[in-house]
Amino acid sequence: MLNIKWIRENQELFDEKLSQRFIEPMSSKIAMLDGEKRKITCLIQEFQHARKVKSKILGNMASKSGEEFEGLQRDVKHINEKLEELEQDLNNNNELNELLNMLPNIPDEEVPYGMDESMNKLVRTYGETNPNALNKQHFELGTKLNLMDFEQTAKISGARFVTLKGDLAKLERALINFMIDVHTKEFDFFEISPPVLVRDNAMYNAGQLPKFAEESFATTNGYRLIPTAEVSLVNIVADTIIPREKLPMRYVAYTPCFRSEAGSSGRDTRGMIRLHQFGKVELVSITTTEESKNEHEYITNASETILQKLNLPYRVMLLCTGDMGFAAKKTYDIEVWLPGQKQYREIASCSNCGDFQARRMKARYKEFGSNETTLVHTLNASGLPIGRTMVAILENYQNEDGSITIPDVLINYMGGLQKITTYSE
């Protein structure tokens, strides 16, 4: 959520930042609604003060009867009725909060202006892409190996699900353990095993609700399946005040993730690129205002390191204003090279959300000996999605005979297996 005080004091700049997100000016409407809310709040405070004064006089009166006493009683009763009416008006005046809840984060000054991914800025590349490399797509390779099943799985769960078998299931498990080990041992992230069912308020805190309600799966009894472990991890600090010396707090978690993929009809309908259920290792950092920028580079480096150790070619893109996620103020996308598609595809997003999520979930920190609190900054990064990493391995490590060479760093995690070959039932 955006800072209403900042909007109030920077209306022209606020509208300019909204225009960079291709949103019409909102400052005038917000100022009007904010003014109405503040007026009601001021009246409530005045009536509360008047009630306190009159109640004190009533309590100190020697005679609990008579015209003066009864008149004061009537005054207090009238004040209570008026307060109830005003508080009801305040509770019903949801338009301001509803409007603020639908507005995305303000872009950082370093974010390039642009409407879509074509305007993203190349930051760096890693590894070499070979235009003459073997170029079968991952789903061709997986099904030929008899270790990736879409057809039978569709009978069980419908489209956008997959069943992995044998050595591919083992590769999935190896990747999870490898990624967690790198992040905990080399980057000092603390491993968490969080719930994947959360309440709506947790989704709201993370910026998933109300705007993206249709993109998540909801149960019939008030829970939602997480679209990313970011939701569970950032909420660890909801409604807390953290001692400054404990920051940064860095969390890593592997979870299954669930997305309805609303609006993705016709996109990536084959294979494992876009599934309703997928596994992902997620990174979250909680830090201070001053360290936020450096922490963004740190968490991005952690994600990149996984691809470097797997020797997968990739590039890092700085997203433009029109391509950034809702809660982000600045985002790097990491795109891995897929020979089967002959293009780079997104494999990770690394975002600095500033105090946007923290304001929603009331997460603060304070210096030792101080009573003043400051909103934390939250950052998140994919570290990485297991399915898309497996896609990249299958396509970049494929052999002429359809077998898949295991990347060196995964051989021990695969129990010494160096190559995945066709499974014969």
Swiss-Prot record:
Catalytic activity: tRNA(Ser) + L-serine + ATP = L-seryl-tRNA(Ser) + AMP + diphosphate + H(+); tRNA(Sec) + L-serine + ATP = L-seryl-tRNA(Sec) + AMP + diphosphate + H(+)
An annotated GO cellular component: cytoplasm
Pathway the protein contributes to: Aminoacyl-tRNA biosynthesis; selenocysteinyl-tRNA(Sec) biosynthesis; L-seryl-tRNA(Sec) from L-serine and tRNA(Sec): step 1/1
Subunit text: Homodimer. The tRNA molecule binds across the dimer.
Alphabetized NCBIfam families for the sequence: serS (TIGR00414)
Compartments in which it is found: Cytoplasm
HAMAP family from the UniProt entry: Ser_tRNA_synth_type1
Gene: serS
Keyword check for Translocase: no
The entry's keywords: Aminoacyl-tRNA synthetase, ATP-binding, Cytoplasm, Ligase, Nucleotide-binding, Protein biosynthesis
Protein known as: Serine--tRNA ligase
Family, as annotated: Belongs to the class-II aminoacyl-tRNA synthetase family. Type-1 seryl-tRNA synthetase subfamily.
